[in-house]
Regions:
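Generic beta-strand hydrophobic packing signal
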Residues: 8, 97-99, 138-140
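Short, surface-exposed alpha-helical recognition segments that flank or form part
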Residues: 21, 145, 149
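Hydrophobic alpha-helical transmembrane segments
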Residues: 97-121
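Membrane-proximal low-complexity regions enriched in glycine and acidic/polar residues
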Residues: 12-99
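Extended, hydrophilic extramembrane loops/domains of integral membrane proteins
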Residues: 116-145
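Hydrophobic secretory-pathway targeting helix
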Residues: 1-9
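Hydrophobic alpha-helical transmembrane segments of small proteolipidic membrane proteins, enriched
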Residues: 149-170
């Protein structure tokens, strides 16, 4: 027969094979990245980033991610961490690490990690890794309790009302 071979399925299967081969390396980098962020204060992380130190140079270990050095995307992730860390407190545990093939062109996989922190027991990290093993995107997604959401809402209301009164007075 004159069948057409699907390049899309071949590409996905190739990504699956790559992930199977490098799964332990991806998991190791993910665990060490979260541990590094927790163990260091904002000044140290900022200093490392501004000196272009990748995680490998900081930890003295070899990683498959960001082998050619720190990227702007990793620095963006560090900035997100620095702005979120105060809401989380200290790291208590790292739970499930799930590595899934990313179907987007140029993206190898998406790594999701469940972590528990002192002030927030449900935090999800998401890392999108490119085909060349560079970090494309890193996100920190805390799940807030109803009480935490209400506290933020009250603070926003107070700030909003205060701003209106100040504008009206002057």
């Amino acid at each position: 027969s004159n069948g057409t071979i699907s390049t899309a399925s071949a590409k996905l299967e190739r990504k699956n094979m790559i992930i199977q081969v490098y799964q332990s390396y991806l998991t190791d980098w993910t665990t060490d990245m979260i541990t590094y962020l927790d163990a260091n204060d904002s000044d140290k992380i900022t200093s490392d980033a501004e000196s272009a130190y990748p995680l490998a140079l900081v930890n003295g270990k070899q990683y498959i991610i960001d082998q050619n050095g720190l990227t702007a995307k990793t620095i963006g992730f560090y900035n997100s961490w620095n702005s979120t860390r105060g809401e989380l407190g200290a790291l208590e545990s790292i739970g499930n690490i799930n590595i899934a093939v990313n179907k987007d062109t140029g993206k190898l996989c998406t790594i999701t990690v469940d972590a528990a922190y002192e002030k927030n027991s449900k935090v999800s990290f998401e890392f999108v890794i490119n085909d060349d093993f560079t970090l494309e995107n890193g996100a920190i997604n805390p799940t807030y309790t109803t009480g935490q959401k209400m506290t933020k809402a009250v603070m926003n209301t107070i700030i909003g009302m205060g701003t209106v009164f100040i504008v009206l007075i002057f």
